[in-house]
Amino acid sequence: DLDTVEPMIALPYHPSNAFPLREVIAEPEKYAKWVEEQAVKIFENTPDIHPNLEEKIVPYTDAAHALSDAFPIDRRIRVDQAAIAGCAAGSFENIYAVEQVAHESKKALGQFAFNVYPASQPIMVELNRIGAMNELMIHGVRVKTAFCGPCFGASDCPENNAFSIRHSTRNFPNREGSKPGQGQVASAALMD
């Protein structure tokens, strides 16, 4: 029964750092601190690396309060980049589901770098034929050609100290393209 499956997020810097997404949303400070503690251990021999996920925690403003004083009702981890890519994650079903969320929300999804890579050209053609690609682009999502790059850090490399969420098939240290030996690191979390 798929209704019993809980959405998870694999936090930086290892795929085993998986937690229920609802917990991370409910307690962002706790999990940001935990990620930073892991980074201290992982990058202990790289003194120039200072990831700061706690600075990504910002007030969240509900749309219902947007016309008032932008009343903060909660705090969330600000996402700098998102990508849906790869042979498994770029499926017709996944991208169509994102289009449905965009259509129902009536909000821009591309307020940060959000890239979608269909798994194949035939998938892209079909999503385009039914109007899903146009809907995503109207909502600010950048639609790119089928490409394996985001899965192994060959494209969509986040900026230094950025927080990136990704729905892709691979997860290993520095998989998003970070170069800790050169003083650059980003925090990538996988979502399924």
Feature annotation, model-predicted:
Residues 1-191:
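Fe-S-dependent hydro-lyases/dehydratases of central metabolism
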